[in-house]
Amino acid sequence: MRIDIISVLPKIIESPFKHSILKRAQEKRLVEIYIHSLREYSTDKHHRVDDYPFGGGSGMVLQCEPIDRAISSLQLQRNYDEIIYTSPDGETFNQQIANDLSICYNLIILCGHYKGIDYRIREHLITREISIGDYVLTGGELAAVVICDTIVRLIPGVINDEQSALSDSFQDNLLAPPIYTRPSNYKGWIVPDILLSGHKAKIKDWELQQSIDRTKRLRPDL
């Protein structure tokens, strides 16, 4: 998989890709992640990429030309499965979307900033708009990191224990069951006996029931 991220402020998101699972996935050559500065595609002598909105109003809008140049430049080199725009208007990101994106070969993620992007880009170039929640961030960079982290860990070989990713919360629209580790008794806080019994079938049934109960209690919307 290859992921190209286009951002006005690329340095904001450089660090997360140099650590943990995202770093290991790149070292294993299971994913390539490139961060592109939108300003590099500006024809303005000051590398300006934004302007005031037509019709008035506050804030600045990212212009068509640099975004079009950035996306077109990448498309000349390869075909992309999706061109994603991180936006509070988009479909809410969830595990199913992550599963779908994890089997793609090439993705572009365009990070919104300021008041957003010229709507013509959304009409003519963007294939999918994704929101990570009903709130507004300063820019779409953090959303891009969330999307990348979520989908990359699903790529076969990224996580050594692939069952770990498949058993995460939301994979089957259920929250994960409670998990515990040693010691079994800490300050009188006791691990449920069933988990110490060694009966795998009973443990599996217990975990499923716990997942159902927790989902009903904490996330009935699921």
Curated annotation (Swiss-Prot):
One of its GO terms (cellular component) is cytosol. Its EC number is 2.1.1.228. Signal peptide: none annotated. It catalyses: guanosine(37) in tRNA + S-adenosyl-L-methionine = N(1)-methylguanosine(37) in tRNA + S-adenosyl-L-homocysteine + H(+). It is found in: Cytoplasm. Coiled coil: none annotated. One of its GO terms (molecular function) is tRNA (guanine(37)-N1)-methyltransferase activity. Its main location: cytoplasm. Gene3D superfamilies: 3.40.1280.10, tRNA(m1g37)methyltransferase, domain 2. InterPro entries: Alpha/beta_knot_MTases (IPR029028), tRNA_m1G_MeTrfase_C_sf (IPR023148), tRNA_m1G_MeTrfase_TrmD (IPR002649), tRNA_m1G_MTases_N (IPR029026), tRNA_MeTrfase_TRMD/TRM10 (IPR016009). One of its GO terms (biological process) is tRNA N1-guanine methylation. It comes from the Bacteria. Keywords: Cytoplasm, Methyltransferase, S-adenosyl-L-methionine, Transferase, tRNA processing. S-adenosyl-L-methionine binds at residues 112, 132-137. Specifically methylates guanosine-37 in various tRNAs. Homodimer. Belongs to the RNA methyltransferase TrmD family. This is tRNA (guanine-N(1)-)-methyltransferase. It comes from Azobacteroides pseudotrichonymphae genomovar. CFP2.
